[in-house]
């Protein structure tokens, strides 16, 4: 009987942790999508989390009951004040962790993003001490703002909408979704990279990199890349 109770208690605790993690994943994904694209669609949430639209709808309904999110219209979701506050707390810890991993431990921007998912669960006092050690940065390694830190807001445009035949410098990779970060890293595209837009199609943006190589970037990825063009 005692063993049964212990196992049952452990199961409840594990389920509680898993549920909390799932809530955080959804809130931060919605936050990143709103930050990057201005809106969070069910289809985008589904793609970024690797779950079905039906699963997203089911979880969103539960988050709505907890007053973390609200449906703006069919297939659109936005964070409430409570949801945004919780998401910003997690995003702040995550982005501080990313800078620490890059600046102090020497990881690249993709590795830092992946390992920061573990560090973001450390106590606030640890994260804030790391924040001081790395010089209180205002941005993460991907150019995204760290919540709670004032910074100069520069006018940027996305690679998906910038005029062709312009030379642009990558200033920000919004959203920080691992599949996009990994893809861009494999191409050698990161913050500070120079890109020349040569042509734009319905589904692709054609660009030339500093090394002279030509690349077809899918529009859905180009919309996450914020640039300053000359």
Language model: regions and residue ranges:
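Short, hydrophobic-biased segments on the C-terminal half of alpha helices
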Residues: 60-61
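Extreme N-terminal segment that seeds HTH/winged-HTH DNA-binding domains in transcriptional regulators
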Residues: 2-50
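Mid-protein regulatory/catalytic core that forms ligand/cofactor-binding pockets
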Residues: 121-226
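A short, conserved structural fragment
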Residues: 64-72
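Basic, amphipathic "hinge/linker" alpha-helix immediately C-terminal to the N-terminal HTH DNA-binding motif
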Residues: 75-94
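Key DNA-contact positions within bacterial/archaeal DNA-binding proteins
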Residues: 54, 110
